[in-house]
Amino acid sequence: MAGTAAPQAGSFLLTIFLRHDETKTVEQRNEHLRQTGWYDKFPPEGVEIVAGYVMMGIGQVVILRVPAEKLRDTNRVIEQTAWGGYRTEFYPTYDFKPVREAIPHHRP
């Protein structure tokens, strides 16, 4: 995984919550993901995983750098492969750290 969330022209960051389907065991979920091709198709070509985390009680959270023209491909891969194994939520995202560091801080 790349370690920087720096913006690139023509792309945006997309945070995806992949919430576990708790009606399935881990083995059932993994089998579903194998059958649908999740491991081979995600992320789609041209889309970069910037960060990924496992969050206990939630599932996985993945931050992608998505070229604008790849948004539909990203959506379709998730619809075709992740649904049934995960409930999904999407959040357009930006890296606030450089913004915060540019704000003058007044200290007593």
Residue ranges and their predicted role:
Residues 76-83:
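Short, intrinsically disordered, mixed-charge
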Residues 1-59, 66-72, 76, 94-108:
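Short S/T/G/P-rich N-terminal loop/turn motif that feeds into the first structured element of a domain
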Residues 83-95:
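Conserved short beta-strand edge segments in small beta-sheet-based binding/regulatory domains
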